[in-house]
């Protein structure tokens, strides 16, 4: 998220906007990405990281105190700055920003999706408690978002899923996170997955699919890059499926671009996403992708492309996923056609396409207020 916010702030500053970034837990650390010298960086010194989490009671009491301090300091600073527009990135200030009396237009941008907020479709009908919590999360998000002048979502699919429960929605995609002059040759008999080893990334599903296809394609291999609490479970699953010789788990690497370039197909079996950077990176490097129809991102990236650059299959249909994957494994010409289309599709997410939409939104909101 910091990369996206930095790119947006630098672009707007270049257009002549007066831009401020307000943080809560900076604690003297310099920004990771370079900011335009005209941008004001202000830390409110709330320090949510200091909340005592040793028990639920201490956590909730501490969080309430910190949020009260956050609200007081933020309102004071916004009145001092007298801004035209204030944006919430959807964290602690999301619940109270619209109620601050500083005179600015309030916007919220969601870096998640309906699928992340409303997870009931993953729970069995008999799991009443979790389904009830899911319904409450959906209601709470929609109620809070409706208090903003505009909610910016990452995908058209997400906007359709929320429907009329959210007022004044704009869709602005994430920026392409990388830039490369090179593209993959797609000659290597190698698939790649890049994800945290966490339940929502559903790498167990990736391994199940791989076990199906590697029987008839023993000369192919799968390399998975990431880390997380499910590492040992995934290792055990690989052994149980008998795929250790064709599949490996790797720690995250700073040279991930090189790993994409030496691969031929990206696999994604996530349960939920916002707009996955991994999928955008694959587009830039010319990799065709096979994805489940998770909420959200795969449909906006792959199905809205001018030319097919991958496959999106029904969520959880391992046979359909394996069939599409084998189609790409067998047909080098198809891989390369889709790879070329992916590279062309990448331009939809370039800064010169995405960032002007923010400028247009701000101008529209300010003019409508006058």
Task: Label each residue range with its predicted role.
Residues 157, 175:
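Carbohydrate-associated surface elements
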Residues 85-87, 100-121, 131, 152:
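Active-site proximal beta-strand in glycosyltransferases
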Residues 183-210:
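Conserved donor-binding/catalytic core segment of Leloir-type glycosyltransferases
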Residues 73-76, 129-150:
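Membrane-proximal helix-turn-helix segments that form the acceptor-binding/catalytic region
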Residues 252, 271:
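Aromatic "clamp/platform" in nucleotide-sugar-dependent glycosyltransferases that forms part
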Residues 11, 17-61, 161:
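N-terminal strand-loop element at the rim of the active site
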Residues 320, 327, 334-348, 357-360:
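A short, well-ordered alpha-helix in the C-terminal region of glycosyltransferases
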